[in-house]
UniProtKB/Swiss-Prot annotation:
Its cofactor is Mg(2+); Zn(2+). The lineage of its organism: Bacteria, Pseudomonadati, Pseudomonadota, Gammaproteobacteria, Pseudomonadales. This is Phosphoribosyl-AMP cyclohydrolase 1. It is found in: Cytoplasm. Binds 1 Mg(2+) ion per subunit. Belongs to the PRA-CH family. Keywords: Amino-acid biosynthesis, Cytoplasm, Histidine biosynthesis, Hydrolase, Magnesium, Metal-binding, Zinc. One of its GO terms (biological process) is L-histidine biosynthetic process. It comes from the Bacteria.
Length: 130
């Protein structure tokens, strides 16, 4: 049997996009990147672990903010090039801006409008020493 990680179509940088979705509501929370190690650890630890392209290292979601994503289910799309993580978002905040979702802007009347409130000031989140 082929290794489950080998069935994924990784991009040229060895990454695959991962969409985090609320396991109860189905709402999209965020999108991030995963490499083989991040995906393997996500499955092993039952929590979302991503690859930070800007920092060049593994990023355990919630390691600084406390806003961990507990894994309930992983799905692979029909082309095997996108992962969906069905998660429980601890603390109800997925976005580094302090909002529930990173998708808090809607296109309306020719512009992007903010439609979701900040639930917690990002400075308070990231200076709390989690």
């Amino acid at each position: 049997m082929k290794d489950w990680l080998d069935q994924i179509k990784w991009d040229a940088d060895g990454l695959v996009p991962a969409i985090a979705q609320d396991h109860k509501t189905g709402r999209v929370l965020m999108m991030a990147w995963m490499n083989r190690e991040a995906l393997s650890l996500t499955a092993a630890e039952n929590r979302a672990i991503y690859w930070s392209r800007s920092r060049g290292k593994l990023w355990r979601k919630g390691e600084e903010s406390g806003h961990v994503q507990k894994l309930h289910e992983m799905r692979l799309d029909c082309d095997a090039d996108v992962i969906i993580l069905m998660v429980e978002q601890i603390g109800d905040i997925a976005c580094h801006t302090g909002r529930h979702s990173c998708f808090y802007r809607v296109y309306e009347d020719g512009e992007w409008k903010t439609v979701e409130p900040v639930l917690k000031d990002p400075h308070a989140i990231y200076s709390a020493g989690h």
